């Protein structure tokens, strides 16, 4: 990393402001973040220092902000892409402990904080991205629900914590992209909270909002009642996106065991959901059976009442015919009273007939609903049986892999013991070889000495032989 340039002797307000901005974002403006395939590249910028030159140009602050926007956009691309791929490979609902999801929220928090204006309060200056997020409910009415939920959470005490909770609820609602697009399109409202060259005010913000659409395929579930969102430190972990050339792949057996464990957990979770659904459907079937029995009883009572009314109607008809004949000779007022009584009886009969039709229609509806529930129960039972068979098969595979792992470990221990024994034997053989080599050298030296002695004796003998002659 290049050395930091020393500060100038006479700082100005402009240089102090630029220095403060560079100090806050040293991890962004000191490097250029770019993408190489699926990996993150950090390239050092030798021409950027914490303190600008004594005579800075007007383009330096804009250059720093543009570099920060580009870095944040590339980080957002990598974070979103990695989150989608890992979530699809995982194949289950994500929670707050999932590391790629945590890093995504950290990157989004940095994007929302970029170029944020400081609000002056009696405690000092405060930068919070909760203010812009509160505007979303005015632009998209659906966001009012999560805003109210965030405000009602008892554990949140700071605007930063509320903003983090809002991001999590929007992701759970699968509306984060829609909310961000609506917010970015209203730059006249954002100008109250952001500088003119902030990420949310430039093209990079719109690009990030478009990338967020891909997160709609992810299912996430957060429990924020016990989570401390106020005091979390939002630091981007670059190690998740940097390629390690010396990294070695795990053993194939461990990878298979991990995959089978994930499948087993998924099947068990699915089995629990299916069992809960079956229990709910069974409760509904019991309730429908009780309702059906009650409706059958009411229908029987209504049929008996209809029969009684029909008999009464026949009797009333006979009486009315008799009264008509008798009243032809009677006063006109009596005939009018009898006509009114007959009209009331007909009206009452019509109401009872309509009631019977309504009861029969309700009974048919309940019967059809019961048949549908029975069919759904059969299908769910079949699905549960299939999932249980798959679970048994996965458990068997897991047991086989564990046995294979133990066998390989035992063989490895045995081979290590054999290697150790062979090493000891080899050491002994080398020691004996060294001893034999030393003995051979001694024997050779002795042989040389004997040869010398033989030569000496021979020469002495040759000298003695002439003397005797």
From Swiss-Prot:
Q: Which GO terms describe its molecular function?
A: dynactin binding
Primary location class: cytoplasm
Tell me where in or outside the cell this protein is found. Cytoplasm; Endomembrane system; Cell projection, Invadopodium; Cell projection, Growth cone
Q: Which residues form the RUN domain?
A: 95-227
Post-translational modification, briefly?
Isoform 1 is partially phosphorylated. Phosphorylated by PAK1.
The processes (GO biological process) annotated in the record are: actin filament organization; cell differentiation; negative regulation of axonogenesis; nervous system development; positive regulation of axon extension; positive regulation of axonogenesis; positive regulation of cell migration; positive regulation of intracellular protein transport
The superkingdom of the source organism is Eukaryota
Oligomer and partners: Interacts with PAK1. Interacts (via C-terminus) with Ras-related Rab-5 proteins. Interacts (via C-terminus) with Ras-related Rap-2 proteins. Interacts with PIK3CA and PIK3R1. Interacts (via N-terminus) with FSCN1; this interaction induces neuron axon development. Interacts with DBN1. Interacts (via the second coiled coil) with GTP-, but not GDP-bound ARL8A and ARL8B. Interacts with dynactin/DCTN1 and the dynein intermediate chain DYNC1I1/2. Directly interacts with DYNC1LI1.
Name of the molecule in the record: Protein RUFY3
Originating organism: Rattus norvegicus
